[in-house]
Amino acid sequence: MAKYRKILVAYDGSLSAQNALSLASQLAREDKSWIKVLAVVPPYLGDLELLGVTDIKATIAGSGQDLLSEAKQLADREGVHILTNLEQGEAYEQIVHVAEEENCDLIVMGRRGKGKMERALIGSVTARVIGHTNKDVLVIPETAKLSWENILLATDGSTCCDNALARALEIAQERKVKLSAVSVVYTNDEFYALGQEVMKELYQEADKVLDKVRKWAGDLGVQAELFVRDGEPHQAITAMAVEMSASLIVMGSHGRKGLTRLLMGSVTERIIGYADCPVLVCHL
């Protein structure tokens, strides 16, 4: 991946977090990047005397230190040196804060399995981090690998998606690989009642979005393959990713419908929840 020099890995000891750290280590080896691993423990707000524990703060902090020791062992096996940080508080707030304080370029987070609930909601921490940070976020499924052979950009031509386009082109140029790009015409039962002229305009708009990809790619000497699909955007994009065996999906944090800070755009959230490959979410 192009020019990420400071990487923050959120680590909670889960299998998905272990895989995220392993792949972040791969990225660090390739690009000589700097890694900080962050563990966040919750604050204790109850009655200390009821617990019968004399030093509850040390007990809570100890669990976080255990996580960081585990992370160091994993990083040692990967052959990379990491710095560590232990914070107490709301996980998403601390991840966003540390990424800003340390001037990180990229936040790496794991994504757990693909059960129905996990597909529907990718996790409040991940969603809130993406909703509140201005950093790029790489979300890595529990069993995914990281490679560059088949990069898929999802774009609707919005400003945020243009930033994702620029990042995807940087990656493709740096890695000397082609870039595939897809723009989706949203269709449902009501769509087919719009009339032929309206439908034609929507497809022409998707073509214009991809014309920008073609031009920017051509200016950088990057080979680009362009696709228009229709249907529910998250379904069309994830199906496209499966069809081309995508190794990475790149997209904006939100599209034309905007973004709420506590819940990212539903298309982005659903793609992260359903994709088999890592998803790079780019901000403005």
Language-model segments: which ranges?
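Structural beta-alpha unit
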Residues: 1-2, 23, 54-58, 62, ...
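Gly/Ser-rich helix-loop-strand patches that form or flank binding pockets
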Residues: 3, 26, 30, 92-144, ...
